[in-house]
């Protein structure tokens, strides 16, 4: 199945990874490049959760609260203990007593939030994870048909927020109905997590704590790669800026005015730079020399030495800061 990133997905793409340290490949139609994978710098798998099944293999990783994941990552970096529990976008009340760190054999219970609006009306404002307002209502109607609970009618006023009204017949106890809803409908569901991820192209059964540790270490490695890439770019910028300053300030460009061939021009520039090579941090390459020949006369005449010095100092400060961060 081939897909294309557009709109908000492109925005997310630009915010969760660095294109300069990402491996790219051509898209299915060859018109653009797309990432081989997303080197995300936060525990996206644990934040969103994941579920899948294959021959003899399955996984069910529950979603977790993003802020709690970040706090746990900080504790991980500080060598402190942490504990993670699932948190669901549909809200609801969860019992994590037997969560077992999201490993095989664990189990949690999630309940809808049900309140008594008046003596004949119940209101559901939060539903369990894995259910929808429609599937929840269907389970309530089936329980009513089987005589497990007694209801008069249901109103689904769900919009951006869940609001399901359950109208009860006269004389029916709201408390007993709530107990029946938890016992016989999807107002209470049991979920069995199964932590399974792919590591080095092999399935690995593990808990969410270990997943977070791996994610945190991966984030450190990605940040290190970004800083190393930034340092490389800054060093190259410093080299180019310093080389340009020497070329113009020492009037090396005048050495090429009477040269009749391209080879002689390049040789003259190399000879002119020799007395100043000790000021540079890296070797002057053939490409460096060619770039100097591309500087226009107008740019040379308007060259500001003080401005160039400030630019070089600014680059040096950025290099120092990047080295410190590394």
Predicted features along the sequence, with ranges:
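Single conserved hydrophobic/aromatic residue that forms the stacking wall/gate
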Residues: 1-12
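Histidine-acidic residue clusters that define the catalytic metal-binding segment
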Residues: 25-31
């Amino acid at each position: 199945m081939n897909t294309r990133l557009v709109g908000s997905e492109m925005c997310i793409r630009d915010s969760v990874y660095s294109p300069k340290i990402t491996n790219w490949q051509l898209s299915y139609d060859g018109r653009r490049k797309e990432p081989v994978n997303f080197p995300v710098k936060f525990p996206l798998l644990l934040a969103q959760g994941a579920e899948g099944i294959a021959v003899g293999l399955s996984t069910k990783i529950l979603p977790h609260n993003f802020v709690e994941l970040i706090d746990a990552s900080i504790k991980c970096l500080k060598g402190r203990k942490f504990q993670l529990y699932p948190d669901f976008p549909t809200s609801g009340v969860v019992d994590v007593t037997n969560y077992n760190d999201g490993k095989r054999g664990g189990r949690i219970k999630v309940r809808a939030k049900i309140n008594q609006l008046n003596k004949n009306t119940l209101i559901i404002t939060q539903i369990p994870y894995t259910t929808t307002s429609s599937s929840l209502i269907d389970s309530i109607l089936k329980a009513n048909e089987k005589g497990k609970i007694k209801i008069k009618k249901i109103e689904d006023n769900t919009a951006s927020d869940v609001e399901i009204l359950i109208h009860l017949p006269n004389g029916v106890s709201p408390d007993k109905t709530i107990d029946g809803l938890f016992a016989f409908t999807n107002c209470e569901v049991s979920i069995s997590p199964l932590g399974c991820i792919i590591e080095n192209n092999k399935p690995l059964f593990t808990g969410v704590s270990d997943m977070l540790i791996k994610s945190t270490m991966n984030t450190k490695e990605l940040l290190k790669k970004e800083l190393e890439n930034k340092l490389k770019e800054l060093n190259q910028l410093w080299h180019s800026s310093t080389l340009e300053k020497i070329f113009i300030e020492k009037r090396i460009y005048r050495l090429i005015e009477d040269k009749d061939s391209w080879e002689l021009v390049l040789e003259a520039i190399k000879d002119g730079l020799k007395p100043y090579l000790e000021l540079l941090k890296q070797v002057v390459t053939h490409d460096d020399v060619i770039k100097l020949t591309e500087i226009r006369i107008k740019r040379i005449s308007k060259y500001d030495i003080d401005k160039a010095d400030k630019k070089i100092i600014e680059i040096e400060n950025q290099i120092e800061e990047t080295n410190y961060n590394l």
